[in-house]
Amino acid sequence: MEIGLREWLIVIGIIVIAGILFDGWRRMRGGKGKLKFRLDRSYSNVPDEEGGSAEVLGPSRVLDTHKEPELDESDLPSLSASARDREREHKPAKASKRGKRAAAADVQQGDLNLSAEPREPDLFADSDDDFAADNTRSNAAPAASSSVKDLPPAEEVLVISVISRDEGGFKGPALLQNILESGLRFGEMDIFHRHESMAGHGEVLFSMANAVKPGVFDLDDIDHFSTRAVSFFLGLPGPRHPKQAFDVMVAAARKLAHELNGELKDDQRSVLTAQTIEHYRQRIVEFERRALTQKR
């Protein structure tokens, strides 16, 4: 019995289909082996400790190739400075700085909507719009001074440092504009403070110092100023609502890092992760619990 063209085409088609199925099956087995190999290699690089979030990967490791600015909590200006140090602000030689502080206080900005927790109604309220510009200039520095000097000695300090990824560091004008937008104002001890009001009135919530010694800022030469790192710090006991104040401090540090190409670090000079921030909040809760127990 002769095989016709139709039968030959059927046989050839079956062979081709079988070959395609076999090739697909072979590729599938090979792909599974490669995928498993990649997964095994990636998981072998994950550190054992917590904090392996996206924040610890990528460009943050670039800083390990050069020496970071050294910062200890002892380098930060004391929140309970002596009266002699506070008098420096009122010397005639600081007249130009006071003028710049007054100009900074006049910058009109809206409050940042930063806190994830409900805010106290009067915690971050704006200053009275009925204040005249002259009164603002004359009262801004005394208000800042009185609120800082009245703080008790800090028993615990929460520190968030922002280290520049650029070799040139943070430039003075850009740094000044950024922190003014976050509501910080230049004041006592030649550093910046964040008060209840964006205009610089009310109690001090937290402060920002130069992380490079001597730890201060020179507004007279701010156009030529630069620094490799700055440190935000909040002392306990301190503001009446420390958890809300801490949230504002975190937002200000993140804003600076995002806009000026910086990297967030904790008080141990490790990358600031979500777990670290939560640990800071827990320290605040524990401090408030201890303070309440002592009052009893």
Swiss-Prot record:
Membrane topology: Single-pass type I membrane protein
UniProt keyword Transcription present: no
Cytoplasmic face of the membrane: 23-296
Compartment(s) where it occurs, according to its Swiss-Prot or TrEMBL record: Cell inner membrane
Periplasmic side: 1
Assigned protein family: Belongs to the ZipA family.
Protein name: Cell division protein ZipA
Organism whose genome encodes this protein: Pseudomonas putida (strain GB-1)
Lineage, highest ranks first: Bacteria, Pseudomonadati, Pseudomonadota, Gammaproteobacteria, Pseudomonadales
